[in-house]
Design a protein with these regions (language model features):
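C-terminal accessory regions of radical SAM enzymes
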Residues: 157-210
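Conserved AdoMet/S-adenosylmethionine-binding subsite of the radical SAM
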Residues: 1-13, 19-167
């Protein structure tokens, strides 16, 4: 993979993701990071990991020293329920942040777990409270064994409309679907009737703005 990236100058950003890259020991992880960081056209490294939420003791001072050496590095984690935001999890995120690495969150919309307005609002506000920015809310993919967790898109859109009223802009994620093939992540925007009416009311302003 390192060889492929080194021969593909169009690649400016490399993501280390699932499985979970933090399941490597420190030496192995640094070997991987240093290999990609040594490629001149790779400008940004990203890590995707559930570890801060489920194994926060893995975020050690030594690990953070390693991560700090490879900035600009962005860290995306995944909290799916407010109960996961424990004191240990918050401290783990804070250690990463103190190393100068931004921490964002990518949740998955899960039926019976976080698909109620109260649960989702508590999750998003809780993340903002520990300086973790809610970045994406993924519509649950049709993966094997996950069917019972899937909602329909309409449920997700209604949920986004409700939590928009109880969260600040910094706490609102993008609701996206990761489409198969090369389309990638597609934003799903809730346009409730009140919003549609408001847009129609001010249509002349937008149409004639210079």
């Amino acid at each position: 993979m390192v060889r492929h990236v080194s021969k593909t100058p169009q690649i400016r950003e490399v993501i280390l993701s699932g499985g979970d890259p933090l399941m490597f020991d420190d030496a192995s992880l640094e070997l991987i990071l240093s290999a990609f960081a040594s490629i001149p056209h790779v400008e940004v490294l990203r890590i995707g990991s559930r570890v801060p939420a489920v194994l926060p003791m893995r975020i050690t001072p030594n690990l953070c020293r390693i991560l700090k050496r490879y900035r600009p590095l962005w860290f995306n984690t995944q909290f799916n329920h407010p109960a996961e935001i424990t004191g240990d999890a918050a401290r783990a995120c804070n250690r990463i942040q103190e190393a100068g690495i931004p921490v964002s969150n990518q949740s998955v919309l899960l039926k019976g777990v976080n698909d109620s307005p109260d649960a989702m609002q508590d999750l998003l506000n809780g993340l903002q409270k520990i300086s973790v920015r809610p970045y994406y809310l993924f519509h649950c993919e049709p993966a094997l064994g996950c069917g019972h967790f899937r909602t329909d898109v309409r449920t997700g859109l209604k949920l986004m409309e409700k939590i928009r009223q109880g969260c600040s802009g910094l706490a609102l994620p993008q609701y996206v679907a990761d489409l198969p093939g090369q389309e990638g992540k597609v934003p799903l925007w809730p346009l409730s009737r009140p919003i549609q009416n408001a847009l129609r009311k001010h249509q002349d302003f937008f149409d004639n703005f210079e």
